[in-house]
C-alpha cells in the first residue's frame, strides 16, 4: 500500500523544492488529497482554535445533539441509516462577507480567534492554488482569477464535531461524497480518527497528525484542469469512543464565476483528451449539488452540459 502523501511546505524554500513540487503534483493527480506540515500557521494558533472549538461544543452543542439523537431514536436503529450523518455542525462564512459576528452562542474571543485563523487559511489556500498553477503550467494567479467572479471567492468553514456513536456500523459520521467547490483545507482532530478517502476501490484512512492541515481538491478543480486533477470520494466513519473535531474550510469560486476547463490545458491535451468537462455558473452547480451531494459526481457534470449553451465565458478567467 502506498503511503498517504505528507508534504513539508518548508522544503519549497530550499534544495528540495523540485522534489516537493513533484510530490504535490503526484498527490493531486493520484490521490486528490495530501497532508501539509510546516505550512506557516503557528501551532499556538491551531491549539487555541482547537481549545475554543471543543469548549464551544461541550458548552453549547453537545446537549442539543443528544436531544436530536433521542428524538429520532438513533441509538436503537437496527438497519443502516442512509439519510443523515452522525455530526454536529455550524458554518462560518468569511468571504465575500463574514457572518462571524452574527453566529449565535460564540464567545467574543472565539470569534476573534476564528477571524484570525480564517485569514491565515485564506492566504494558505491562495499560495496552494499558485503552486497548482505552477505544476499545471498555467500562469500564476490563473486559478484565483478563475474563481473570482464579480465579488471574489466564497470562503467559509464548516465546524463539525463527531460524538461517540453506539452503532458506527449502521450510521456514518458523514456519508461518502466529493466536495463541490475548489480547494479544501481541513484542521482535524489528531487523537480521534475517522476520515477516509477512496483510492483504487479501497477506503484508506487519512492519518490524524498534530498541527497538520489536510488538503483535498473539489469538483471545480477537476473541471478547470480538464480531469488532470480529480476530486475524490471521502467519508467520515463514526467512532464508539471520543468526539472528533473537524474544521473544513472551503475556498470556492464566486457564485457567479463561470467554471470551465483551462484553454491552455485543453489545447495541450488535444491529441489524447479533448475538452470533456462542461462550462457552467458555479451557483447553478451548487443548486444541483445540494440535491445530489451523496451521489456520483459524473451525472452532475452531465446535467451541467445540458445547460452549457446558455453560459457566457467571462474573459477575466482566460489565460
From Swiss-Prot:
Gene3D superfamilies: B-lactam Antibiotic, Isopenicillin N Synthase, Chain
Cofactor(s) in the UniProt record: Fe cation
Top-rank lineage group of the source organism: Eukaryota
Keywords carried by this UniProt record: Ethylene biosynthesis, Iron, Metal-binding, Oxidoreductase, Vitamin C
Name recorded for this polypeptide: 1-aminocyclopropane-1-carboxylate oxidase 4
Gene Ontology BP term (one): ethylene biosynthetic process
The protein's enzyme class: oxidoreductase
InterPro entries hit by this protein: DIOX_N, IPNS-like_FE2OG_OXY, IPNS-like_sf, Oxoglu/Fe-dep_dioxygenase_dom, Plant_2OG-oxidoreductases
Molecular function as annotated in GO: 1-aminocyclopropane-1-carboxylate oxidase activity; 2-oxoglutarate-dependent dioxygenase activity; L-ascorbic acid binding; metal ion binding
Protein family (similarity comment): Belongs to the iron/ascorbate-dependent oxidoreductase family.
Cited SUPFAM superfamilies: Clavaminate synthase-like (SSF51197)
Protein's pathway: Alkene biosynthesis; ethylene biosynthesis via S-adenosyl-L-methionine; ethylene from S-adenosyl-L-methionine: step 2/2
EC identifiers of the protein: 1.14.17.4
Catalytic activity as recorded in UniProt: 1-aminocyclopropane-1-carboxylate + L-ascorbate + O2 = ethene + L-dehydroascorbate + hydrogen cyanide + CO2 + 2 H2O
Domain Fe2OG dioxygenase: residue ranges: 153-253
Binding-site residues for Fe cation, renumbered to this chain: 177, 179, 234
Cross-referenced Pfam families: 2OG-FeII_Oxy, DIOX_N
PROSITE patterns, alphabetized: FE2OG_OXY
KW Repeat (keyword) present: no
Amino acid at each position: 500500500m502506498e503511503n498517504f502523501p505528507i508534504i513539508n511546505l518548508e522544503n519549497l524554500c530550499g534544495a528540495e523544492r523540485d522534489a516537493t513540487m513533484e510530490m504535490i503534483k503526484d498527490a493531486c493527480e493520484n490521490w486528490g488529497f495530501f497532508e501539509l506540515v510546516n505550512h506557516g500557521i503557528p501551532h499556538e494558533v491551531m491549539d487555541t482554535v482547537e481549545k475554543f472549538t471543543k469548549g464551544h461544543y461541550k458548552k453549547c452543542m453537545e446537549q442539543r445533539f443528544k436531544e436530536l439523537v433521542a428524538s429520532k431514536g438513533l441509538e436503537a436503529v437496527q438497519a443502516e441509516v442512509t439519510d443523515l450523518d452522525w455530526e454536529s455542525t455550524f458554518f462560518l462564512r468569511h468571504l465575500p462577507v463574514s457572518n462571524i459576528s452574527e453566529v449565535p452562542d460564540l464567545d467574543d474571543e472565539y470569534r476573534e480567534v476564528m477571524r484570525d485563523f480564517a485569514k491565515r487559511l485564506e492566504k494558505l489556500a491562495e499560495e496552494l492554488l499558485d503552486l497548482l498553477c505552477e505544476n499545471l503550467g498555467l500562469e500564476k494567479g490563473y486559478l484565483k482569477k478563475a474563481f473570482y467572479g464579480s465579488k471574489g471567492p466564497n470562503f467559509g468553514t464548516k465546524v463539525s464535531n463527531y460524538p461517540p456513536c453506539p452503532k458506527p456500523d449502521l450510521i456514518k459520521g458523514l456519508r461518502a461524497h466529493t466536495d463541490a467547490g475548489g480547494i479544501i483545507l481541513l484542521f482535524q482532530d489528531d487523537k480521534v480518527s475517522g476520515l477516509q478517502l477512496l483510492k483504487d476501490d479501497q477506503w484508506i484512512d487519512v492519518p490524524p497528525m498534530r498541527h497538520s492541515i489536510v488538503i483535498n481538491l473539489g469538483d471545480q478543480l477537476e473541471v478547470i484542469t480538464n480531469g488532470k486533477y480529480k476530486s475524490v470520494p471521502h467519508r467520515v466513519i463514526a467512532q464508539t469512543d471520543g468526539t472528533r473535531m473537524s474544521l473544513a474550510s472551503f475556498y470556492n469560486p464566486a457564485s457567479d464565476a463561470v467554471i470551465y476547463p483551462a484553454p491552455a490545458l485543453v489545447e495541450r491535451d488535444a491529441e489524447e483528451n479533448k475538452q470533456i468537462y462542461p462550462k457552467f455558473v458555479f451557483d447553478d452547480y451548487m443548486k444541483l449539488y445540494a440535491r445530489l451531494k451523496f451521489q456520483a459526481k459524473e451525472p452532475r457534470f452531465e446535467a451541467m452540459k445540458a445547460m452549457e449553451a446558455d453560459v457566457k465565458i467571462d474573459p477575466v478567467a482566460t489565460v
